[in-house]
Amino acid sequence: MTLTDEQFRQLYEVEQTCFHGSWSRETLSTEVNSPLSVLVAAQRDGRIVGFALGRVVVDEGELYQIGVLPEFRRQGIAEALLSELHARMTERGAVCCFLEVRSRNAGAIALYEKCGYERISLRKGYYDDDDAVIYRKKFRETS
């Protein structure tokens, strides 16, 4: 997905709002512009209100971030973003997608499990104040 300067500004605003500045503008720009990256965005009235960003390396996808502005949550946007991200990853040859989430992020965990992700691992003490849970969704079985 190629972004205009205004679209990138909106994307960065969503990232900052949802993740409290976990990525710098430069980091987000680098990831968005990487040939390995997959970006999907949701818009309302021409404004980006949510996005999902990941990448595909060989046959594995990884979800880096998914965020929806608070006033647009609980409307199915995150599910739609994940579905589109998975479709694009599959087009690029991915057979599965991995993600990592804070163990106390109940809302995100509920979304991922609803969308078919399975918990495969726990990284104790990964964050200063929390563990990380690793999830995987298989798009198709490998031989």
Model-flagged regions — what are they?
Residues L82, N105-A108, G125-D130:
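Short glycine/proline-centered loop/turn elements that form peptide/ligand docking sites
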Residues M89-E100, R123:
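Conserved GNAT acetyl-CoA-binding A-motif
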Residues E100, E113, E118-I134:
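Conserved catalytic-core motifs of GNAT/GCN5-like acyltransferases
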Residues S37, C96, R102, D131, ...:
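Conserved catalytic core of the tyrosine transesterase superfamily
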